[in-house]
């Protein structure tokens, strides 16, 4: 079988993190089996679809490196044998209308002239009788004359699919196993609007068939659409693709992931300083695991190890703490040159002037606490003291400089440092330890005041490497300043 899968988002807002996971699982499935990953833009919602949202889809997929083999591109061009890949363009090309006409001619669809008010009254009547809100088929058997009379009133019809009501619809779900819906629980869904635009359920059936999709892998929220779509495949005499429905993503409280749980727009994660590779690794584990319960994957490894059989049925819980841990692991493994490139936009965003710092020095400064960064966005705040005047942590001065020996320590170590040349880590450490020993101090009585004086922090990077990177002039200046307010 030729493996063909698709990611088919609607451009009605930002690209949701759940959408990215759906794209990822389709991408991995295609790569695992040498198949084709297709992007199709389902922009048949004339009121809500926007070009800005389409660009946001490109932004999200490009940042996460989920690059498609077929589909539209940012520049308006398309690649693939089944263009166009925007459903609005397919409407203009008349692709859907002939299939609407076919169903009408065969009695498998009908025109419905009911107004929104009439439909609401039907829903209320069904609710009063404790029946499901299923369209009762009022317009199913209208004569040509009755249709003409309604159109003379100015009514424009929708087209409804004539849903079979006998038996059941069954399929072997790739993730959930056997699934069955009673046909009596389905309804005559609208497949074409008065504008001539097809609805989601109809357009995706036509496109998935014409584009030769072998597997449809999508969220669990689509599972109720599947029996209706299968009935449409049967109406045309087509073989449906295989379906697999991914588990929902929930927040830590067990409810559907939403903004109250944190960011849901994939680009927000980019802005917050997450590495795309880390986010992709994390999303792969939201509802899937391999037999080794592996957590971290090397480049290209997910493509080799992904197996749809490893996808779970129960909802996946989005754990921000685990994502932070995973991102820190990826940051730790990133070569310092690349990490510096990634960090620079965040540094500039905080208006930290690095223009007078050469590249090698900047890399050394960023590297000094590389093992501690959880996100790129944390880097500016942790290195700011290298470039700007010290801003003391709350309580840092009182904690360190209120001690009786602090002023003598600072003045004494300043004299020691003035005589060190070159101002290097090893020499600084040796001289500091010698000063402590010679003057009867514990090393902590020296290290802590010096650290706070030069960085404003009570904890931080390796002390003597930090002093070397700050440079002799800056260190001496800051120590002298600190001595002025010692013994406060």
Swiss-Prot record:
<feature type="binding site">
    <location>
        <position position="141"/>
    </location>
    <ligand>
        <name>Zn(2+)</name>
    </ligand>
</feature>
<dbReference type="InterPro" id="IPR001412">
    <property type="entry name" value="aa-tRNA-synth_I_CS"/>
</dbReference>
<dbReference type="InterPro" id="IPR033910">
    <property type="entry name" value="GluRS_core"/>
</dbReference>
<keyword id="KW-0963">Cytoplasm</keyword>
<comment type="similarity">
    <text>Belongs to the class-I aminoacyl-tRNA synthetase family. Glutamate--tRNA ligase type 1 subfamily.</text>
</comment>
<keyword id="KW-0067">ATP-binding</keyword>
<dbReference type="InterPro" id="IPR020751">
    <property type="entry name" value="aa-tRNA-synth_I_codon-bd_sub2"/>
</dbReference>
<feature type="binding site">
    <location>
        <position position="112"/>
    </location>
    <ligand>
        <name>Zn(2+)</name>
    </ligand>
</feature>
<keyword id="KW-0030">Aminoacyl-tRNA synthetase</keyword>
<dbReference type="Pfam" id="PF00749">
    <property type="entry name" value="tRNA-synt_1c"/>
</dbReference>
<protein>
    <recommendedName>
        <fullName>Glutamate--tRNA ligase</fullName>
        <ecNumber>6.1.1.17</ecNumber>
    </recommendedName>
</protein>
<dbReference type="GO" id="GO:0005829">
    <property type="term" value="C:cytosol"/>
</dbReference>
<keyword id="KW-0547">Nucleotide-binding</keyword>
<dbReference type="GO" id="GO:0008270">
    <property type="term" value="F:zinc ion binding"/>
</dbReference>
<dbReference type="InterPro" id="IPR049940">
    <property type="entry name" value="GluQ/Sye"/>
</dbReference>
<keyword id="KW-0648">Protein biosynthesis</keyword>
<dbReference type="GO" id="GO:0006424">
    <property type="term" value="P:glutamyl-tRNA aminoacylation"/>
</dbReference>
<keyword id="KW-0436">Ligase</keyword>
<dbReference type="InterPro" id="IPR020058">
    <property type="entry name" value="Glu/Gln-tRNA-synth_Ib_cat-dom"/>
</dbReference>
<dbReference type="InterPro" id="IPR014729">
    <property type="entry name" value="Rossmann-like_a/b/a_fold"/>
</dbReference>
<dbReference type="GO" id="GO:0000049">
    <property type="term" value="F:tRNA binding"/>
</dbReference>
<feature type="binding site">
    <location>
        <position position="259"/>
    </location>
    <ligand>
        <name>ATP</name>
    </ligand>
</feature>
<dbReference type="GO" id="GO:0005524">
    <property type="term" value="F:ATP binding"/>
</dbReference>
<dbReference type="Pfam" id="PF19269">
    <property type="entry name" value="Anticodon_2"/>
</dbReference>
<dbReference type="InterPro" id="IPR045462">
    <property type="entry name" value="aa-tRNA-synth_I_cd-bd"/>
</dbReference>
<feature type="binding site">
    <location>
        <position position="139"/>
    </location>
    <ligand>
        <name>Zn(2+)</name>
    </ligand>
</feature>
<feature type="short sequence motif" description="'KMSKS' region">
    <location>
        <begin position="256"/>
        <end position="260"/>
    </location>
</feature>
<comment type="subunit">
    <text>Monomer.</text>
</comment>
<feature type="binding site">
    <location>
        <position position="114"/>
    </location>
    <ligand>
        <name>Zn(2+)</name>
    </ligand>
</feature>
<keyword id="KW-0862">Zinc</keyword>
<dbReference type="InterPro" id="IPR004527">
    <property type="entry name" value="Glu-tRNA-ligase_bac/mito"/>
</dbReference>
<comment type="function">
    <text>Catalyzes the attachment of glutamate to tRNA(Glu) in a two-step reaction: glutamate is first activated by ATP to form Glu-AMP and then transferred to the acceptor end of tRNA(Glu).</text>
</comment>
<feature type="short sequence motif" description="'HIGH' region">
    <location>
        <begin position="9"/>
        <end position="19"/>
    </location>
</feature>
<dbReference type="InterPro" id="IPR008925">
    <property type="entry name" value="aa_tRNA-synth_I_cd-bd_sf"/>
</dbReference>
<dbReference type="InterPro" id="IPR000924">
    <property type="entry name" value="Glu/Gln-tRNA-synth"/>
</dbReference>
<keyword id="KW-0479">Metal-binding</keyword>
<dbReference type="GO" id="GO:0004818">
    <property type="term" value="F:glutamate-tRNA ligase activity"/>
</dbReference>
């Amino acid at each position: 079988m030729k493996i063909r899968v698709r990611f088919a988002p609607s451009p009605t807002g930002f690209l949701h993190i759940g959408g990215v996971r759906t794209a990822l699982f389709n991408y991995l499935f295609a790569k695992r089996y040498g198949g084709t990953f297709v992007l199709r833009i389902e922009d048949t919602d004339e009121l809500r679809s926007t070009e800005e949202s389409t660009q946001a889809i490109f932004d999200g997929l490009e940042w996460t490196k989920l690059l498609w083999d077929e589909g539209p591109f940012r520049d308006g061009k398309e690649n693939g044998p089944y263009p166009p890949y925007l459903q609005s363009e397919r409407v203009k090309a008349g692709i859907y209308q002939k299939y609407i006409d076919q169903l009408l001619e065969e009695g498998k669809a009908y025109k419905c002239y009911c107004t929104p008010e009439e439909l609401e009254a039907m829903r209320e009547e069904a609710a009063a009788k404790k029946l499901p809100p299923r369209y009762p088929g009022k317009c199913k058997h209208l004569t040509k004359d009755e249709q003409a009379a309604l159109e003379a009133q100015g009514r424009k019809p929708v087209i409804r699919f004539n849903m079979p009501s006998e038996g059941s619809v069954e399929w072997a779900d790739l993730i959930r196993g056997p699934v069955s819906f009673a046909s009596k629980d389905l309804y005559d869904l609208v497949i074409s609007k008065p504008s001539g635009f097809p609805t989601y359920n109809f357009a995706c059936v036509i496109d998935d068939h014409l584009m030769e999709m072998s597997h449809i892998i999508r969220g669990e929220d689509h599972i109720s659409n599947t029996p209706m779509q299968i009935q449409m495949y049967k109406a045309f005499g087509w073989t449906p693709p295989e379906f697999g429905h991914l588990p929902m993503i929930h927040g830590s409280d067990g409810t559907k992931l939403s903004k109250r749980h944190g960011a849901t727009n994939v680009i927000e994660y980019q802005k917050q300083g997450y590495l795309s590779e880390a986010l992709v690794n994390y999303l792969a584990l939201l509802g899937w695991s391999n037999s080794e319960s592996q957590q971290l994957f090397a480049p290209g490894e997910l493509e080799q190890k992904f197996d749809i059989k490893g996808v779970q049925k129960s909802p996946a819980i989005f754990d921000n703490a685990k994502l932070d841990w995973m991102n820190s692991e990826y940051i730790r493994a990133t070569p310092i040159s690349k990490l510096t490139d990634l960090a620079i936009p965040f540094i500039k965003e905080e208006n930290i002037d690095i223009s007078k710092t050469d590249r090698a020095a900047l890399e050394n400064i960023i590297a000094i606490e590389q093992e501690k960064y959880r996100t790129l966005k944390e880097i500016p705040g942790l290195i700011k003291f290298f470039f700007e005047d010290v801003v003391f942590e709350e309580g840092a001065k009182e904690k360190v400089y209120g001690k009786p020996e602090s002023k003598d320590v600072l003045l004494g170590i300043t004299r020691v440092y003035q005589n060190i040349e070159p101002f290097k880590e090893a020499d600084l450490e040796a001289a500091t330890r010698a000063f402590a020993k010679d003057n009867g101090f514990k090393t902590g009585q020296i290290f802590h005041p010096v650290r706070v004086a030069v960085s404003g922090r009570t904890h931080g990077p390796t002390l003597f490497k930090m002093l070397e990177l700050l440079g002799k002039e800056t260190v001496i200046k800051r120590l002298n300043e600190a001595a002025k307010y010692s013994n406060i």
